[in-house]
UniProtKB/Swiss-Prot annotation:
Belongs to the bacterial ribosomal protein bL9 family. Binds to the 23S rRNA. The keyword Nucleotide-binding does not apply. One of its GO terms (cellular component) is ribonucleoprotein complex. This is Large ribosomal subunit protein bL9. PROSITE patterns: RIBOSOMAL_L9 (PS00651). It comes from Shewanella sp. (strain W3-18-1). The keyword Cell membrane does not apply. GO terms for molecular function: rRNA binding; structural constituent of ribosome.
Length: 150
């Protein structure tokens, strides 16, 4: 299926690119999320008329993400207290939601879907650097310190 992208999508293309994707990916993800439109003559004309508006919106989102990244980088270590055993092993784990809630409590809005833990949840006490992806082009690192509850 041939579609016109309305947003930058990783491993696919930028705003305004006409790309060929599998029909299921287009119908189930790109079209319902508003990230693309079917590339027919009328949609191409409508897109060209709205191109400047969409580029301005994309630039505003990028600027907002950069501001949030600066705030996150400026944060000192976010402390999360969790129950732990004698050797520093946690009873349970610290996951995306816990980190997002702690950063939000520290004053910077963060959604759990923006937290990246490629090795899974954190299961020991200590200091960690967690990557946060705020936009397709903007990443930041949050310092997380997990301490045992008294």
């Amino acid at each position: 299926m041939n579609v016109i992208l309305l947003d930058k999508i990783a491993n696919l293309g930028n705003l305004g690119d006409q790309v060929v994707v599998k029909a299921g990916y287009a119908r189930n993800y790109l079209l319902p999320q508003g990230k693309a439109v079917v590339a027919n003559e009328s949609n191409v004309k409508v897109f060209e008329a709205r191109r400047a508006e969409l580029e301005a919106k994309l630039a505003a989102e990028l600027a907002a993400a950069n501001q949030r990244a600066e705030k996150i980088t400026a944060l000192e270590a976010v402390v999360i207290a969790s129950k732990a055993g004698d050797e520093g092993k946690l009873f349970g784990s610290v996951g995306n939601r816990d980190i997002a809630d702690a950063v939000t409590a520290a004053g910077v809005e963060l959604a759990k879907s923006e937290v990246r833990l490629p090795l899974g949840a954190l299961r020991t006490t200590g200091d960690f650097e967690v990557e946060v992806q705020l936009h397709t082009e903007v990443k930041a690192v949050v310092k997380v310190s997990i301490v045992a509850e008294a």
